[in-house]
């Protein structure tokens, strides 16, 4: 594949073939699992190279046809010529169409019902048409009924689901529908600027189009007004419907590495047929590539016509990836009611569903999604591995994760991170332990992990010099009555003592108080384990003996006390080691297993203790800081960091602190739990500002803020914004959002906000009723018809009171400010708008049916006085 690739597309009726185009056009076949041929291979997808088409270079647009006998494409060129290619050596001149006037071909669309009919769109020419309907079996079109749009340009084109109506975006200002069933095709048009990317959903209920950063949804059966507009932060590059889902719309945005998905839902509330959507952004790149710079942007996407939620992606105009959407559970909240969106299902049953009947040792985890008819469908990934739903935790189906996240937000989860506060929240023990660990490690406005504290792999940096200190080692003496020839070497340094404290262990002189605290918290086995690690074996026996009196089943503690009190390592170490592996399976308490592993160790081999995952990472790290040499300690820290990244264990932040490894741990936890709330709040509370340049942190925070907005939790959102702003540099950036005049485009905000001196009523009214630059009238309030910026009570002779040295905008109550709907753009004074929507549901403008207040989750009848 030479040069950059501009686009790619699956063939609708050839599920294993796709075409890519750029300088040349190439045909590929996805390699089967048992195919080991080496004809050609792309870097990130196993394919066989089949053919290329060199006659048509630098294609402007390419469309794969619906022919079922052979792969055929239509190619549109910059000079307007359109060619039909079947990747054979034979040349047929009848398969080329050249318009009368030379200009660029802009769009192509095959008819799904009649595979020989092609719709062609060209750029504008004043004496020629821009839309051509070509039946390739009948040769070059000549009848006037096949040409439309004289003196116009075609921006995009598609077919309706009845396959007899052509829908075209024309001249950047309208959408036209041409019904070809009529002898002289009738035309229906609607004025709009969203004319790019026209496409009809698989169920035929929605028509989508876009311009810049706005996506518009239409009803193709009644296209008088849009159903909904979706605003994005970036301009769109491509939009497309997923063919295996009823209403899943995908969008690629310029200079973005994410795929944005909109799950469109219609809820018939009071016969209004309101449209809602659930937005989701996913990164198609493997986690190990997300921060490596290997991939930057997604340039093109092509959905597979049969495989469930499978797509081809073009990254950086060079790399082609075969991608399938990860399994997710959707539960959304509308502003009026809760909308449950369960496990997504395909539109139809695959032709050959896979079945698994392997032995227990060979069986791979599979799952199925039940359809309404009771049958089951198994979905497989392109590589052959099963579409695994069983990997989702069962709690996800039993608990409403959205409700849980929303409830935590209402309880100020993560706003004030302190241990007492987290004890009052409804958190899992895992999250409560994670936050407690982070609070313990966080000091001096930094989350310094044990890796930095111990000076591991820091080179010759200043942190390494601060962490370097003299390490003392001493041989510990076993207690009297316990004969053990193994030398137990303990390592001490200032950094290791600090690490022990960060792990929650007390200093030697405060050990008894620490053990008593654990005993008071009924952590008996952990207290006994720490005593044994400090060679206070008889103290551990006393703890377990006292604890056994308070237990319903004291047998395990009693047996442990007997074993410890009569332990003699030199006499029975071999016997204990032989029995330990089988006995550990019977001991359910991990702390007791660690006790026996420690006592029966061979020389300085502590692997059994360090690999006991039932013991918390902080306890294992404290043990490692006490008994491991420098080299072994560094290796163990590196192993645990990698294990935390692979498993998504937030406890690994104890080791990494605020670093790139810490961000990788958060990303891995996010991938496995979908808990964007915890990930965002950890980053906000404990990561320094320099790390906020990482796109992943920005994405987590933006996603969580979007959740708060969708729930109408404006005050919680504001509190979080204030907290985020407090950790940023104190230098305040200049204002970047202005009110601009519709006529001259200049800022009106300065005139509206900066009024340091009181003015007379007449002067102020005249000045505020028009643009200060072009003097054109400003918008009026929909209810009182006063101009924007005019105080509500000015017409009654009241003047706003101002105080010296106070800007004018601070003396205006919020209820007198101007607000407007983001959908219909109608507005007015906030006080008037609030009063109107307490009694009405539609926009106050008589010709507008927009339900403006439904965009907010707050009920009008419960609003408090905002003046």
Swiss-Prot record:
Gene3D superfamilies: YVTN repeat-like/Quinoprotein amine dehydrogenase (2.130.10.10). Signal peptide: none annotated. One of its GO terms (molecular function) is zinc ion binding. Disruption phenotype: Egg chambers contain 16 polyploid nurse cells because the oocyte enters the endocycle and develops as a polyploid nurse cell. Coiled coil: none annotated. InterPro entries: MIOS/Sea4, MIOS_a-sol, WD40/YVTN_repeat-like_dom_sf, WD40_repeat_dom_sf, WD40_rpt, Zn_ribbon_mio. Zn(2+) 1 binds at residues 741, 744, 771, 774. WD repeats lie at residues 51-86, 100-144, 149-188, 190-228, 231-272. Disulfide bonds: none annotated. A zinc finger (C4-type) spans 739-777. Zn(2+) 2 binds at residues 784, 829, 832. The keyword Repeat applies. Zn(2+) 3 binds at residues 821, 824, 852. The keyword Repeat applies. The WD repeats are important for recruitment of the methionine nutrient sensor unmet. This is GATOR2 complex protein Mio. It comes from Drosophila melanogaster. The lineage of its organism: Eukaryota, Metazoa, Ecdysozoa, Arthropoda, Hexapoda.
